[in-house]
Structure formats: C-alpha cells, structure tokens
Amino acid sequence: MVADTETILIDNVHKPYAAGLLMVRPGEQIYDIMIDTYFSEDYSIILDSFEERSTKVLYDLVLRISTIVRQEQSTFTIYFHNFSRFDGILLLKHLACHHKSYKLKPLMRNHRLYELAVYSGKKMLFRFRDSLNLLPGKLSALAKNLCPGLGPKGSIPYEEVTLSNLASMKKSLLDYMKQDILLLGGVMKKAQEIYWKLYKVDIESHITLSSLALSIFRMKYYDASNWPIHIPNKNEDSFIRRAYYGGHTDTYKPYGEDLYYYDVNSLYPFIMKEFPMPGGVPVWHGNLEGKNLDSMFGFIEAYVVCPKTIKKPFLPYRDKNNTLIFPTGEFVGVYYCEELKYARGLGYTVLPISGYLFERMESPFSDFVSSLFESRLEARISGNEAMAYVYKILMNSLYGRFGINPKSTITEVCDEDRYKHLIRHSELIFGDMLSENNYIVAYHSNTETGSDYWNPPKNSAVQLAAAITASARIYMYPYISREDCYYTDTDSVVLGQPLPKEVISSSVLGKFKLEDRVMKGYFLAPKSYFYIAIDGTNVLKYKGPAKNQVYPEWFESQYADPSRTELVPVEANFRIDWHTLNIIKKDTLVRLGIKLGTKRIPVYHRDVWVDTDPIDIKDLSSLDHIGKQIIKSLRNDVILLQTENNILNEKFSQKEREIAERYKEMKSQFDAKKNTDKSTPPLLSTFRVKPMSFSSYMLEGY
C-alpha cells in the first residue's frame, strides 16, 4: 500500500487536513479511483473544531488499514514519500495518543524514522516505511523515470491554503494528493517488478537501499568462503573508525574564469572494483617501532609531519571542532596504510605507532561493480531509463552499508516502566510524556563500557568503508594537487586547464567527464559556490539554513568582502520538535556569511582574495603514555640518524675540500713546470689534470 497526508498550519504547527490510501498489487493496473481519501471538512457536520476533524482524518486512515489487514489476513507495509521526516512523525504521535490498544515499535536512528511497526499484542498488524529509503530522489523525477505514463506531479499554492477556504478548495487539494499517491504507487510497483525480475528479491523485505544492495551482492556476487567479511568488535571498530574520514572537499582559489568542471564516473564503485581491500581477521600490534611501513597493510596510528612546502596537503585531520582539514605541521592520527605510504612519497615524515593489520586481498566487489556498470550502460543505450536508474542507485549504495556507525541516537515510544528503565540505565538525551503511559525517549546506543553492551548493526564493516574512501582520496590527489585546481568535492575538480584526453570518457568507469565549461566562477567555501556555464546557465550551491537567501549577487559581494556577514530571516517550514512530536514552522534570524580560516587560510594580493594556504598545526594530544614513549624513542632515532648524517656530510665536505686543494696544488705545479721546461716530451704535453668528485677520488684510491 502507498499513502500520503496533506497538512495546514494552525498556530505554526502542521495539522493534517487530508489523507489517502491506495492498495498496490503486483501485475495489476492502478487508477486514481482506487484511492481512499479522508478530508477534514467532510466531518464538519459532526465535529466542530478543526483539531478534532484533523484527528479524525488520521483515525479513519488507520481504521481503514486495520480493516484491510483483517480482511486480507496478511501483514501489510504502507509506504509514504518522506515518511522519515514528515508523515511518520504525524502518525507516530497520532497512534501513541489515540490508539492505546496498539503497541508501537518505531525504528529510529539519528532522528530518522525508518519504520513504524504496529502490533496487537505480539502480532504485527502493519508497518509504515519511507519510500525515499529505497528509492532516493524527488517523486517527480522518480515517476518520470519509472512510470512516465501516469503523468506529471501536480502542484498547489500552499501559501493560499487556509482554514477558511479548505472546503472550497477540496477538489483541487484532493486531486493533487491523489496524483501524488498514484505516482508513488506506480514508482513502487515498477521498482518491485524490476528487482524481482533481475534478482528475485522483494523490495518489501528491506528497509533501505544499502541493505537491498548488500543482499543482492551477497546472493549473486559474493563468495563468503574465499572472502569472509570480518565484523569488527568494539575495540576494532572504535580504532578503525578514526581512519574513516570520508570525502575531501576544499576550496583553493576563490575566483576564476574559463575553467573546467570535471566529475569522475562512479568514483567509489571504481575504487571498489580496482583497489585491494583489507581482508581476514585483524591482528593488533601495540608497538610498531622499527617496523617497515611498506610491509604493513591495515590501519595505523602514526606520528606525521607534513612540510610547509606542500601547498595542498594530502592527509586529513579532524580538529577540535570536528572540522575535517588537510593541514601542514605535526600531528597524530589513524590512517589507512596505503595513504600513509602515499603521503611519505610526497615528502611527509611518517612514524607508525600501533594499529590493526589485515591481509591484503583482491577486492570482492569487482564482479558486482562491473556487472551493474555494464548493465547500466546497456540500459541507457537502449533508452530504458528505469533500468538505468535502478542499476545506478544499486551500484552507488553498497559502500555506505559498511560504514554505518554503531554509536547512534535511538528514539523510542514506550510505557512508563520502560521509560524509567532507560532513565536509569542509558545515556539519556531527553524523555517526555506524549499521553498517559506513553513516553518518547531519546538516548545514545553502544556507548556503554564492556563488550557485553556492544550491539552493532548487522554487516557493519568499517574497515571496508575506510579503505574505499582513503583509496578514493589517493586516486583524486594528482588532480587536486595541480596548481590550477580551484575547487574539489569528493569526486569532482574544477581546473584552469583541460585534462589530457586519455583520462576523459563519459562511459568508462573511473575516468573523468566534463560536467561543465565555466565562464566564471566563485568558490568561496566547501559546498558554497556559484558559476556561470559557457552556455549561460547559472549553477548555484550553498549549504546552510539560509540557502534560499543566497543569489548570484551575494557571491559577488561576498568575494569582494569575504568577512561580510548579514542577518537574514529564515523560514524553517518543517522543523521537528522531538519532545512533542510536532512539526512546526519557525522563523529565525541567521547570520549569513562564510567561515574564513576554518579549512584553509585566505591569501590576499592588494586587498583582493586570490588564493589560500593550508592551516599549520601541532597536536599530539591523542597520544597515550605508550604512544608518547614510542614517539620519543623514534624522535631520538631520527635525531641520531640526522646527527650521523650531518657527520658524514661534514666528512664528505672535508674530503671534497681536500680534493679541491690537491687539484689546485697539482695544477699549479703542472703550470709552473710547463712554463720552465720547454723540452717537455710530447706525451706529457697532452696531459691534463681533470677535477674529480669525492666518490671518483675514493675509487681511484687516493
């Protein structure tokens, strides 16, 4: 089943005025006349207040679902588009407050409601889920790809919908909602058909796309006997997760003209296909002093020195504000061995301290990625956009499953006994009463000490996610480190000169495609840029609550005065109050500007911002006592080697001076003899003394 709700603002709180439900069966056509609808103003004869009528809309929707479940004698899944952050919040509160006979089991992590299961006793009757978790994207775009025959998504003037004109606008409002429900039904039906046809997998058996991708990988491409994926314990996960930094986003030059914007074709899938992966069971090494870095493969805590001569440093580092920067200086961090080796080749000093070592193994993902990428190309060539879309999202979703963090925020709706237990025995964030004997509680999971409390998500293997992202940074660095690189964001670069033809292709995995030719562009901060493409198109991106207040002129003004800030009004139309489970509209004032110097330091020429320099740091605070002793010992070794090197250099210099003096003396004697002895034999008259290097001098036996 698929469903939708429509809301109106009453005292800045969203209240449902309409709801609809459509039964979708495999192989059967769907029509809008099959949609059950519930409209608040239809109850105006029996209910005076809108609050009561709004409650009745959801009450009858739930009642209809319960009736279908009893008639069909089957458990049903009902999908909403954006259930996690909108419809699901409305339903969770409604069920907790108005359906006391039901037991609710919400699956909520990090303030995202993935599933809301409804029980009668111990029997699950139905469950609500978010279609976005399986099919990410706007409903209009999904429908265009998967079910174009059902027509386009409609629109309504939300700002014109008021309590006073709800009744008069009934037809247009219900038509809009019914079209959304019809499109969602078509999208889910087509997706279910495709996945069943290709893989014999029912999408209803998985909540998220990454889980679905993992299931298909395991079923069709994975050989567990030859490549068992190790699930880390708490100590392993906590250590290796420090090496899971993600993508690299930075702005280097704030303004440029006549530029080239490139994207890599499926960067992470390419890395998963071509690069080795950490396999086997990790082995802990508490002291790697004196060990050869080249012989290691795994995740290492290392003491690192990046010279100030490196303009665009390679190794990431999280500062005290949890900002990911790429600094010069002296610091300690946990890194994938391959990026430490790469950094050393760039001129970094790398001293391994401790870490988990794995087996270096060929990637288990090669067949999975190759098959999906080739199938996607074939689908695009044949014009089958629906299949091409499915192959693309599957290929790009597997990696994220391995990086799921076991430490998360869990939200429960529970009775008073459970509420009191969580207050006493969990790392509580908040707890509030929703209704009699119904409480909402949020707490942190997997934060207790001891292995008995460790309950990570199934198939969480952070070593794979960390290796993939680190290898991607290695792959991108030759392009990022170019002098003409203006901006980078994980799998893209903006360059002043074109890339060579041999690395360009729109259809080869891992090669670059020209996304845009940029006439002029402003790159003021990570994920905050504006450029005019060569065809005149304006492309603008800004990350932050005030993004609707940002225009091309703002980028021009901000570039002229980077420190400029202004207070702007911002409407947050769908803010969730987790204490009350209300979705509210909130108007706030936000200071709009860019944060200078948090990732790189701006460089000015005659008061014009022209470039950036890396931040220089010194931070050894993460070292424990053993680590400090190891670093002290390694530093002493380095100092000793430097001293020995200086002594040898001085000896070499002394020998070279002696050779030079000896050469000068011999030449002087020879010249004097030549001038005084006119009867020199012919053989000697051709003799020349040539200068010699110290090494030649030693070889000659002087």
Regions found by a protein language model. Name each.
Residues 10-641, 645-647:
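Conserved acidic
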Residues 630, 637, 644, 651, ...:
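Heptad-repeat coiled-coil/leucine-zipper oligomerization helices
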Residues 678-702:
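Eukaryotic intrinsically disordered, low-complexity regulatory regions enriched for S/T, P, E, and Q
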